[in-house]
Amino acid sequence: MTSTASAARPSRGDELELTIDSLAHGGNGVARHDGYVVFVAGAVPGDRVRAVVGKAKRAYAEARTVEVLEPSADRIPPAAAHPGAPWQVLPYERQLEVKAAQVGEALERIGRLEGFALEPIVPAAEPWRYRNKLEYSFGTGPGGELVCGFHAPGRWDEILPMDDCLLASERSNELREHVLAWARAQGLTAWDRREQHGLLRNLVIREGRRTGELQVRLVTSPGAVDTDSLVDAVRCDGLFWTRQEQLGETSLGGDTVLLAGTPQLRERLSGLEFLISPEAFFQTNTEMAERLYGVAAELAQLRGTERVFDLYCGIGTIGLTLAARAREVIGVEIVEPAVADAIENARFNDVLNARFYAGDIRLAMRDLVAEAGRPDVVVVDPPRAGLSQKVVRRILEAQPSRIVYVSCNPTTLAPNAAQMVEAGYALERVRPVDMFPQTPHIECVALLTRG
């Protein structure tokens, strides 16, 4: 049995003909080669493809499509060559079906949860040009020219140029082209990810979709930049330059200076106006963020008498949208600049019943309960990794009547919800929200109540 399984297992570089059965969390197709699972990038259910194996492990392999031999009946022509929109080959209704099913499957299979209501998915308001923030990378094209775009699928060292990003607005695309034209005129070089030299690394463009404001941040290695000519070439409401010394590719950290304009971008959401610093987290789909937070408010069932803890509060978006319906809101966030923005946003909007603190939730939760009292409702909006078991225990110790969990990853929501259910909570409702059309990413909001 062992020798048969070993013989069936492909090796790196092998080419396989595969039929795709389903889509995995994360968006890759799932196929089987003599019973051995292969995750295939660039394929959808029903496709028969030729794929090359990039990684082979004992239980599964990862491969990428090199040719679609027989397309699925579901497959449609892509709107554009865009590595950031891998699901554009599926009709939008089919995307919604798959995402909703994946949320339910994760909760049932990973969390072993049952008895909850999986509510209809909230579709996106716009299938294209919905992002308010894009992060591009600089690279060198095949002819030696400077390019600005996205990483090629599965490649950390190759950047594909982007003439028109269909996830960004026309104005955002124009700004990218202005920066690229300036950089080419200056004769600047891109960061070489193999040799680890070169100047230009990333370009981050953020747009206030409801205010019209534009924020641009150029990320480079340490070195000289003609900032005066950059200011002349790029017209926006806030222009920043970040010098990054880390060898790994990241737009976070480094030394950031404001070259022109205002230090924060303004955006309107749920009747409030938010000030957003260059590195602050803000949902990248403004319209759907408003709907997501509306779902959170609905599930929180606030009547104006509750104390709400907003954990992983960021710049205060969720907490401040709930404040008008609660007695008080207390937010906690480990990133200090985000907390400063949250405090400023509360003042800016004259919200008097919201307080925000900087701290590690694992360490701060007990002191917060001792000082402020037990919360009636806890709202959590953690990163993709979800909550640690210790953070879940701290929330359970506080004994809120309701927990509203805003999740960007159902595979980490599932074990967190299972831990809460084991402690006596009931998972009542889960509603998926499609924030990111044309991609495999899915958000959802879950309600857990104390028995």
Feature roles, as predicted:
Residues T2-D14, V225-G451:
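Rossmann-like S-adenosyl-L-methionine
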Residues A43, V52-A56, S137-G141, R206-R210, ...:
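Short beta-strand micro-motifs enriched in acidic
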